[in-house]
Amino acid sequence: MMNNTVFPLATVAVIFLISLVVGCLIGYAIRKNVWETRAENARQSVEAILAKAKAEVEVAKAEIQAQKQAAEAVKRDAETEKKAKILEAQEEIRDYRQKVEDELNRRRDEAARKENRLQQKEDTLDHRSSLLDDREKQLTQRKAQIKQQEEKVAGLLEEAHGLVEKQNDKLLEISRLDEEEAKKIVLAQVSDHLTKEKAELIRANEEEISARADRFAHQIIVDAIQSSAADTVAETTVSVVDLPNDDMKGRIIGREGRNIRSFEAMTGVDLIIDDTPNTVTLSGFDSIRREVAKRALQKLIKDGRIHPARIEEMVDKARKEVNDDIYEAGESALMELGIHRMNPELVKILGRLKYRTSYGQNVLAHSIEVGKLAGTMAAELGLDEKLAVRAGLLHDIGKAIDHDIEGSHVEIGVELTRKYHEPDLVVNAIAAHHGDVPKLSFIADLVVAADTISSARPGARSESLENYIRRLTELEDIAGSYDGVKQAYAIQAGREVRVMVEPGKISDDEITVLAHEIRDRVEKELDYPGNIKITVIREKRAVAVAK
């Protein structure tokens, strides 16, 4: 009984152990399968991630390679453009250098011509001095001859008295005339003889006096020229502006040259940029435009912001400053000469002469000099000194605006002085100082003499510069005479004319016709060396302000 009980327990225990072992094995197998599944899934996930990452890396490599190729292409394009810009800049530099060299050669030639003229004047003065010495010797000899003739005449008179006495005795003996009648006859004969001798002496003395008067007149003129001599600086057609560094040249030129084109169009002055370190050159025959351009460029350099709108603003400011300086120059001239009560508009026109030259001579300085000379001579002669000074100062007032108004500077000056109620004698002196009308007073004669002394003194004037300016003025006048032309500037020393037209009056098609018409008139009416380029510019702007 007991054995039967034990057996089932053992069996149960064995079964339990077997079941436990089988359960463990089954659990292990299941867990192993799960682990293997998870490991496979993890491996597949890792492989997928690695494949995705590898694909992304390949894409990134492709993009980087594409970007690298694009960068290489951009670099090659930049190098090509850089080389082209360098070649273009070098070409422009060569052109500017050639222009500057041509200008320097022209100035050297002009200086050589001036030196030759000065040498000729010195030779002429030496020759005149030698002639004066010879004339003085001749006068000394003539004086000795006159003295000898006087002694001879005295001897003849004594001889005549002796003859008279003999004739008296003879007449008394022959005609039995009384002494008084005989004396009358003899005196009449002697008087006729002495009259002839006296006439010869008078003619000789008149010739001598005339020669001495000429010599004294020459001496007076020389003294007047020496007393009126003033320091004179030769006028030029260029101004030099200093730069803080050479990098500023590129900013002045601007992108594709737009800044330099805007500057030249707004000022009418040629801006020359060459390889001269830290400097640029402004070239133009109109001194007022050149001064405006110089001040505007200096302001732009100081400000640092250089673009077309800023250029236009600075040019307007510089033009206002120059206009103020012109008025101050007129007032200074009046104060220097002690002239009062002149119309302000006439004072402003007078100040413009500061920037006007005639044959290379500054017209304002020349006018002040003429006023001083005329006043000095009027005071010496007891005439109205203040009126003479006023007439001398205003005698060339027409030259201030003769580029803008039709007519000679004399006609313009007469019209201006009448308009602003100057005295009639002043108006007549202006009208008569070139012999166009009769002189009504000695004041007009004094103005002519003072004008001659001031303009004729050595080194005062240079004809070549005046001819050059006249040619450029005529060139601008031809270009500006057409309807629709707003402004016309002669630049490049007269080798180019830039014509600004009004877009509302002239179309794009018409500017070509206008350029050819201007060319034909220039070829027909002007004499000039080389070629002249006619450039017609039509620009239309649209401006809107956002608030």
From Swiss-Prot:
The SS bond pairs are none
Query: What Enzyme Commission number(s) does the record list for this chain?
Result: 3.1.-.-
Coiled-coil segments, which residues?
none
A GO molecular function annotation here is: RNA endonuclease activity
What keywords is this UniProt entry annotated with?
Cell membrane, Endonuclease, Hydrolase, Membrane, Nuclease, RNA-binding, Transmembrane, Transmembrane helix
Which GO BP annotation is one of this protein's?
mRNA catabolic process
Q: What is its main location?
A: membrane
Keyword RNA-binding tagged? yes
Q: Which Pfam families match?
A: HD (PF01966), KH_1 (PF00013), RNase_Y_N (PF12072)
Topology with regard to the membrane? Single-pass membrane protein
Q: Which portions of the sequence form the region Disordered? A: 107-138
Nuclease: is it a keyword of this entry?
A: yes
Catalytic class of the enzyme: hydrolase
Q: Which GO terms describe its cellular component?
A: plasma membrane
Q: Which InterPro entries match?
A: HD/PDEase_dom, HD_domain, HDIG_dom, KH_dom, KH_dom_type_1, KH_dom_type_1_sf, Ribonuclease_Y, RNase_Y_N
Q: Which HAMAP family match?
A: RNase_Y
Protein name, as recorded: Ribonuclease Y
Please report the organism this UniProt entry assigns to the protein.
Lactobacillus delbrueckii subsp. bulgaricus (strain ATCC 11842 / DSM 20081 / BCRC 10696 / JCM 1002 / NBRC 13953 / NCIMB 11778 / NCTC 12712 / WDCM 00102 / Lb 14)
Q: What is the lineage of its organism?
A: Bacteria, Bacillati, Bacillota, Bacilli, Lactobacillales
